[in-house]
């Protein structure tokens, strides 16, 4: 299956999933991908790829000649990402690696686009490494859910003097209940965009 549209936001249900493997939801994914300012034929590194939704959509957007390097420490996430890459026809330009991101990042080909989809307490070190590797003009986007991760990221970016933007995104999806439509909220997400 390939995605026939030129816009991001493939419906969540189109992706292969596995219990315990996180997925960036369609609406958040569309915003994060727009913040990355992807380039045709470009390269992206996706840290903490989970089900590979960001990786797959980035590979589709950047098209032929592009490369996406997806990293996750969870072997199941790596397996699911590979399956989603094959399902959407981007397996030839999406390389998936299992391991610790801080160890793998310096070994990958350089990129000026990084997506940090996890990181927890390592988020400041991931930002630092990505900023160093991205070089001038690089864009690093992270999505975080917890206030603790947000604080860690903002403290690092402020202390490092890095230009950044932040947006809190709150999405509610409509669903039918007893003949009525109600809105069911997704978790609020903070999208942080840092510029190297």
Curated annotation (Swiss-Prot):
Pathway: Cofactor biosynthesis; adenosylcobalamin biosynthesis; cob(II)yrinate a,c-diamide from sirohydrochlorin (anaerobic route): step 8/10
EC number of this enzyme: 2.1.1.196
This protein's record includes keyword S-adenosyl-L-methionine: yes
Catalysed reactions, semicolon-separated: Co-precorrin-6B + S-adenosyl-L-methionine = Co-precorrin-7 + S-adenosyl-L-homocysteine + CO2
Keywords: Cobalamin biosynthesis, Methyltransferase, S-adenosyl-L-methionine, Transferase
Gene3D superfamilies found in the cross-reference section: Vaccinia Virus protein VP39
Biological process per Gene Ontology, one example term: methylation
InterPro entries: CbiT (IPR023475), Cbl_synth_MTase_CbiT (IPR014008), Cobalamin_biosynth_MTase (IPR050714), Methyltranfer_dom (IPR025714), SAM-dependent_MTases_sf (IPR029063)
UniProt binding sites for S-adenosyl-L-methionine: 24, 48-52, 72, 101
Keyword S-adenosyl-L-methionine assigned: yes
GO molecular function: cobalt-precorrin-6B C5-methyltransferase activity; protein methyltransferase activity
HAMAP family: CbiT (MF_00786)
Annotated family: Belongs to the methyltransferase superfamily. Archaeal-type CbiT family.
Protein name: Probable cobalt-precorrin-6B C(15)-methyltransferase (decarboxylating)
